[in-house]
């Protein structure tokens, strides 16, 4: 009886190991250093066709399910890619030298606005009325034809403070993570803006709003969160 139990146990272990073995066999690895002159992956995005786009410190790569191919275009080649974002059939490429819109259906790449040329683009977001672009020091408001509406400068006099991240919610609020806290921008009906500091402290690395309408604030080794509808400096709760 003991012998039978041991056999059953061995068979069970073998059966349970198959899914993990299959998973390991299906994991693909790409060594950028071995074949390309790229070092750091900075972002990843999936488009409406299911293809994966990788932003690197020296350009953009496309993974079509079989292989990696560099996106070769004079406007974005050799650019440091801060982030990738997509809307409909357009991939938005935020670089240290401007924001570019790449239509992957027509294979066409354009600078979104001359105002953004040579600027360090940190984030791109949109709502039903506006397109909002954050550089490391400023926030630009555009309509959907990339006509300029308004610009707000954050920490104009501070040389050691920069915008690190941005999220928008509703049609009239944008939240900025900076190297020293959290700033909210209220967008008026006429497109004018005003800003207030909600929280001062350590550098904010990333902001995220979840499906329950809670704001997550990543500060390196610590995460803060708050209900976005009642956000103020008192109601932010922290956990590790």
Model segments located where?
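Carboxylate-rich, polar loop motifs that coordinate divalent cations or form catalytic acidic clusters
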Residues: 1-240
């Amino acid at each position: 009886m003991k012998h039978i139990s041991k056999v059953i146990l061995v068979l069970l272990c073998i059966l349970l190991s198959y899914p993990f073995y299959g998973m390991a066999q299906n994991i693909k690895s790409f060594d950028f250093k071995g074949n390309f002159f790229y070092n750091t992956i900075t972002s990843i995005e999936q488009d409406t066709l299911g293809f994966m786009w990788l932003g690197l410190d020296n350009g953009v790569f496309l993974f079509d399910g079989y292989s990696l191919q560099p996106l070769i275009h004079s406007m974005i080649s050799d650019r440091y890619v801060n982030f990738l974002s997509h809307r409909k059939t357009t991939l938005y490429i935020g670089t240290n030298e401007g924001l570019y819109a790449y239509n992957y259906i027509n294979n066409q790449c354009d600078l979104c606005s001359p105002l953004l040329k040579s600027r360090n683009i940190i984030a791109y977001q949109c709502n039903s009325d506006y397109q909002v672009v954050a550089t490391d020091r400023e926030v630009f408001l555009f309509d959907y034809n990339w006509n300029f509406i308004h610009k707000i400068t954050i920490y104009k006099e501070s040389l050691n403070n920069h915008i690190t991240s941005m999220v928008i919610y509703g049609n009239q609020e944008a939240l900025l993570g900076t190297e020293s806290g959290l700033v909210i921008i209220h967008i008026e009906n006429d497109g004018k803006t005003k800003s207030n500091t909600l929280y001062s402290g350590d550098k904010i690395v990333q902001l995220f709003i979840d499906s329950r309408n809670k704001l997550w604030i990543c500060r390196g080794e610590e995460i803060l969160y708050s209900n976005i509808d009642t956000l103020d400096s008192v109601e932010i709760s922290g956990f590790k």
